[in-house]
């Protein structure tokens, strides 16, 4: 079967298994080239199939020889249709991990649901006993709330007033003006429900109650702050409110983990074109200009370079984890 790229809006709807496998291999090779990290040995990655989640899983496995369980929601291949990229990424990761003699299993389903939480906990209990690191890296536009049954949809809108700026179409290279109408209060609530910290806290509570968290466990979620040019639509918009909620949740989770001497952190990562970020107007144009400057300065890093630094220099550096005045780990410091 010959796979041609097919586009829908900003998303390429077809993926190439060999390209995905090569991407995974390149990341593994990078981690191996950087040497061992004295990190966690039993790791759960929620949102493990693309972007920062996939790179976190690769860093744990090939940097620290960790056993990993990955949770994600991806489409397998069907008649005449390739699988989603995350499906191929995860298949390639498992193949490479098993080849290296590492434990790696995955659960494909809705991480927001009670059912997938239970399946994951059963697997941890049966195979690993406990985990000493939980990475939370979900990027989803919708969330069915497991307790209320309400379907929440996140939106990317400014708060209070209309936002206008330039953006770029990646397919044509054309720069155009884009305007986004302000959100309603309901939009803010829905976006917090999908992208805030509630589900992260639910995972940690469930794992703790089932005695599946090891002493001194760490849990990390990912965030982005960005520049003033994207502030109105990003950090001071609906998504920013969700990120504020996520960051506040880290402190609540740290309180929950006190009895285990555990800690929760939010890591602020650098701007990247990922499936998640390319959906945001203005961001593609900002990032394309930013990349040029960072590459000239030698400071550009993909997801794997950032995660290698997070694990080696921040989380598992042999002493205290460096944070800023708000308690955030800053990977966007370079």
Which positions does each model-derived feature cover?
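Glycine-rich phosphate-binding loop and adjoining beta1-alpha1-beta2 segment
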Residues: 65-104, 110
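The beta1-alpha1 cofactor-binding region of Rossmann-like NAD(H)/NADP(H)-dependent oxidoreductases
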Residues: 108-120
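Catalytic loop of short-chain dehydrogenase/reductase
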Residues: 153-261, 268-291
């Amino acid at each position: 079967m010959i796979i041609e790229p097919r586009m829908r809006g900003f998303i390429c709807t077809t993926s190439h298994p060999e390209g995905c496998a090569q991407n995974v291999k390149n990341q593994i090779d990078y981690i191996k080239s950087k040497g061992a990290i004295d990190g966690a040995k039993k790791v759960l990655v929620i949102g493990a199939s693309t972007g920062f989640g996939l790179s976190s899983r690769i860093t744990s496995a090939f940097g620290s020889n960790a056993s990993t369980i990955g949770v994600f929601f991806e489409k397998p291949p069907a008649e005449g249709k390739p699988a989603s990229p995350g499906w191929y990424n995860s298949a390639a990761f498992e193949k490479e991990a098993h080849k290296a003699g590492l434990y790696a299993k995955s659960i494909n389903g809705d991480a927001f649901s009670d059912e997938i939480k239970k399946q994951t906990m059963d697997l941890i209990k049966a195979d690993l006993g406990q985990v000493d690191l939980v990475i939370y890296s979900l990027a989803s536009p919708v969330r069915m709330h497991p307790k209320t049954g309400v379907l929440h949809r996140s939106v990317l809108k400014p708060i209070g007033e209309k936002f206008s700026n330039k953006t770029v179409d990646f397919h044509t290279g054309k720069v155009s003006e884009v305007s986004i109408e302000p959100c309603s209060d309901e939009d803010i609530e829905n976006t917090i429900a999908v992208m805030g910290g509630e589900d992260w806290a639910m995972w940690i509570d469930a794992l703790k109650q089932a005695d599946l968290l090891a002493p001194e466990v760490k849990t990390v979620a990912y965030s982005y702050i960005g520049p003033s040019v994207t502030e109105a639509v990003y950090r001071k918009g609906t998504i920013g409110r969700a990120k504020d909620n996520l960051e506040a949740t880290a402190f609540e989770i740290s309180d929950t983990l006190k009895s285990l001497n555990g800690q929760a952190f939010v890591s602020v990562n650098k701007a990247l074109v990922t499936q998640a970020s390319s959906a945001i107007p203005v961001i593609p144009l900002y990032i394309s200009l930013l990349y040029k400057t960072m590459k000239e300065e030698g400071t550009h890093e993909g997801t794997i370079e950032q995660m290698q630094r997070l694990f080696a220099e921040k989380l598992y550096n042999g002493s205290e984890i460096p944070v800023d005045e708000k308690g955030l780990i800053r990977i966007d410091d370079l």
